[in-house]
Amino acid sequence: MQKLDFLLCSLPRMTMTYPPSAPAVLKSILLANGFTARTRDFVCEWFYKFKDHPEYNAIDSWTAMGALQVEKDIEKEIDDTVTQWAQELCDTGAEWIGLSIFSYESHKLGKVFAQKIKEINPEQKIFMGGSGITTISEKYPQKLYDAGMIDAFITGEGEQSIIEFAKGNFDYPGINDMNYKQVTPEIIDRTPEPNFDDYNLDLY
């Protein structure tokens, strides 16, 4: 079996208007640079898991509001679901599991996913990226990093920094700090098309 370098995951909460592109873009870049990568679309999986649930509105709000509590049976259902998914992620043997944080509404599940993954395999390496850890005033990724819940984070646009990260250049601006570089038009122009091969686009 071929070694898997990166498993890149989209996380709720996002609308189902269109598929989350960030993991698909990063996958295409990694593949073009000789790394192995797959994606997992938890935005879609979460929606279809819970959309017919009688308490869907409460579950949907729970993901977006950090302090919101739900009934114990719903909390257990969420916990069991994320635990199962975390186990599936660990079972892939990926060197790095990437959690894409689109906005602050993904913060709660991002932390839960990281906790579950580390409980299953404390040696599993996790990194976070996305606008939801870049355009915020609070030190969300830094707190998780300092607590050992994640092993790295990438701020800013990831088109160039993901390559540096994959090569082990953790001193590159935006890796484990907020001092990221703006992506140049030249880098954008040579970015390959997003790779949606692991997505079920018919569900959008």
What annotation goes with each model-predicted range?
Residues 4, 35, 124-125:
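A structural micro-motif
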Residues 14-23:
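Glycine- and acidic-residue-enriched helix-capping/strand-helix junction motifs
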Residues 18, 48-50, 138:
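Short Asp/Glu-rich motifs
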Residues 22, 26-30, 39-44, 75-187:
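Glycine-rich beta-alpha loop elements in corrinoid/cobalamin-binding modules
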Residues 37-83:
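Conserved N-terminal ligand/cofactor-binding loop architecture of enzyme catalytic domains
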Residues 188, 192-204:
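Radical SAM [4Fe-4S] cluster-binding motif and immediate context
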